[in-house]
């Protein structure tokens, strides 16, 4: 039986959001995942929390004020009034305006911040938010289906209590937004295993190693089509083992994008659920506090399979391959099994290619200072303490939550067809981006005391009755909060 304390964040509103017809990103996959988690009985081994929605001030700990204000105001009905801002903030095409877009961002980011709060307070050893992992969003720009970067916000929360945080990305796409945010600091190390070449976002070369104090603290392993379980683990394990030894993080954040699985609508890797989940299992062996987030994944039946299986790994629960009855059983036919089989695609990642890159990256790690220390600073207040507002429901009754979810389906939502419009454009036709200082975050500024999450999150409470909030005494404080100046020079000092 698992001795790890595991927290799991889920909001039943998240699956109601819809990017639009033929768009590959389908938030409905989170509802499917949660339904499998419930019906496999995994939920009994976790504490389940509905996340607090991130406030405007919380989001602007990384994002610019004008960008967040725009996301808050724009809707499909009034978007014609924001034509200049749509271009400025890249909210178009792959990042469309959709109903409830800002609410979706609040849920995703609030869950990932909540994960960090649980880890910081030592109430959890592992915290999960499958609605998070939106790693492409920039400080003032949407990108790659991502509007707010919940990962950066979660890491900033972790940095309140941990000198060093390690970020690992196993999505098929490079974790560019997170890398850019922390490119010049040694307090966050980013490690990304991704498809590289004529493929979105076009960044993540092995030569991209960080800058200034962050030099050698960005590590990229560019991969080719068709990598399988064995090849992936032959690089993941030695690289991560060395990173853990050299860097010695106080906490680890892993983005578990499921588009690196075989058969993904936009992907070109050949990993099975077991191969993907072995990354999680390996990280568990280090017994370091772990935040586990979602990410990409566009064959949604496999996304749900993957994240359910990885949830079971985190709570040490064995699952039968035969899927239990669930509300979305028809999605999983005709096999109705948990595990998937690899296809016969060629693995273009030769042993020589992988070995050469592995040696190069291990050599880069030797340039690191062992476990760099941050300057002493006062610890800012934690974000909202979920212990003050835990759900009093009997956990065994939670399975009925699936029946309480709003069943909002949209035309085309059930399809994983490769023939839908946009497959080619979404997978590798988007314009590549480059690392930019304007997308970085000031860690030294964040070390200074900021308003607590408790005081700045209550604007959302009146609209979130499902959260059973008990903290209504702070509502009068929100309007007095001041945003940071996004035009200030970026300072990435360690302390």
From Swiss-Prot:
Lineage: Eukaryota, Amoebozoa, Evosea, Eumycetozoa, Dictyostelia
Underlying gene: hdaA
Reactions it catalyzes: N(6)-acetyl-L-lysyl-[histone] + H2O = L-lysyl-[histone] + acetate
Chain intervals with Low complexity compositional bias: 454-480
Residues annotated for a divalent metal cation binding in this entry: 171, 173, 259
Alphabetical keyword list: Chromatin regulator, Cytoplasm, Hydrolase, Metal-binding, Nucleus, Repressor, Transcription, Transcription regulation
Protein name as annotated: Type-1 histone deacetylase 1
Coiled-coil residue spans: none
Cell compartment(s), UniProt: Nucleus; Cytoplasm
Similarity comment: Belongs to the histone deacetylase family. HD type 1 subfamily.
A Pfam family the protein falls into: Hist_deacetyl
